[in-house]
């Protein structure tokens, strides 16, 4: 639709984005993440300027982050291991089915494990008390388990009335609520530079989602020495740290995103 609009008004288009890739699906090639200049409909044809995330971190425009993959902690907790091989792709091939994720959660008691991790984060052995803990869950069940188990925890979901959501988030920013579990609604547009702890309590095949969720803690603030990214589902292993992401032009405008030498865009999932 937006391509038709641009063509109708016959204007030049300048795009600004922190995530220059989009999900594309086709019968022949399945699902893949494509660099924005290589998508159809073809709206953007050229990259005129780019900057690497690592450069912005070095210059202080973004906050430093510590990443904590918690794979081994689950084994210590109950002897289980989160296995992505048990997850099945949905019909588009772009993400996992709800049912396969739920079955894996039940197999490893993911709900109890999430409560255990958040309780530890509320009283860390090192690094000082956290300003706020924002938890990203896939389903409402995990978020509800947190509120039942940990006093002072609130839920924000697509069903939360607007005024109630605003009240919860203001209380969170004021330190009156220490933990907010959100179900797919604060991935983008949530402005809280002081936020220092993000818990990724869901698996994803989406680089854009991973980047956006990590981005909730990457905004700098004088009171924040370092943000924590706590990953319970193997996403760090899949995508790497955002500082590892590199935009690279292999020639003739064939841009792609790489992480630690591994190509993430314009390759089949």
Show which residues each predicted segment covers.
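Conserved segment of the helicase C-terminal RecA-like domain
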Residues: 209, 216-247
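SF2 helicase motor core recognition
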Residues: 60, 179-199, 215-219
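Short glycine-/polar-rich loops that comprise or flank the Walker A/P-loop
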Residues: 9-12, 44-46, 62-65, 151-152, ...
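Cys/His-rich short segments
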Residues: 250-269
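Conserved interdomain linker/interface between the two RecA-like ATPase lobes of SF2 helicase motors
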Residues: 42-134, 253-258
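Conserved helicase ATPase core of P-loop NTP-dependent helicases/translocases
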Residues: 134, 142-146, 151-188
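Post-DEXD/H (motif II) to motif III coupling segment of the RecA-like Helicase ATP-binding lobe
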Residues: 1-67
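Conserved nucleotide-binding/hydrolysis micro-motifs of P-loop NTPases
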Residues: 11, 18-23, 55-58, 71-76, ...
């Amino acid at each position: 639709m937006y391509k038709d609009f641009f063509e109708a008004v016959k204007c030049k288009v300048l795009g600004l984005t922190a995530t220059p890739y989009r999900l594309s699906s086709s019968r022949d090639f399945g699902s893949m993440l494509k660099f924005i200049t290589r998508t159809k409909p073809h709206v953007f044809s050229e990259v005129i300027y780019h900057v690497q995330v690592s450069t912005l971190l070095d210059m202080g425009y973004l906050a430093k982050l510590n990443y904590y993959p918690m794979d081994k902690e689950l084994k210590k907790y109950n002897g289980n291991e989160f296995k992505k091989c048990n997850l099945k792709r949905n019909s588009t091939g772009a993400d996992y089915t709800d049912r396969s994720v739920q079955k894996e959660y039940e197999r490893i008691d993911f709900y109890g494990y999430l409560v255990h991790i958040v309780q530890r984060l509320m009283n860390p052995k090192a690094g000082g008390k956290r300003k706020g803990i924002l938890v990203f869950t896939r389903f409402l069940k995990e978020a509800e388990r947190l509120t039942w188990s940990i006093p002072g925890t609130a839920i924000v979901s697509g069903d939360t009335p607007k005024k109630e959501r605003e009240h919860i988030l203001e209380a969170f920013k004021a330190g009156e609520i220490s933990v907010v579990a959100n179900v797919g609604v604060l991935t983008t547009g949530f402005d809280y530079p002081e936020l220092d702890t993000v818990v990724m309590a869901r698996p994803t095949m989406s680089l854009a989602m991973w980047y956006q969720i990590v981005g909730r803690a990457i905004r700098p603030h004088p009171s924040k020495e370092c943000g924590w990214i706590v990953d319970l589902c193997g996403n760090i292993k899949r995508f790497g740290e955002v500082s590892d992401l590199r935009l690279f032009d292999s020639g003739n405008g064939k841009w792609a995103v790489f992480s630690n030498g591994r190509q993430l865009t314009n390759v089949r999932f």
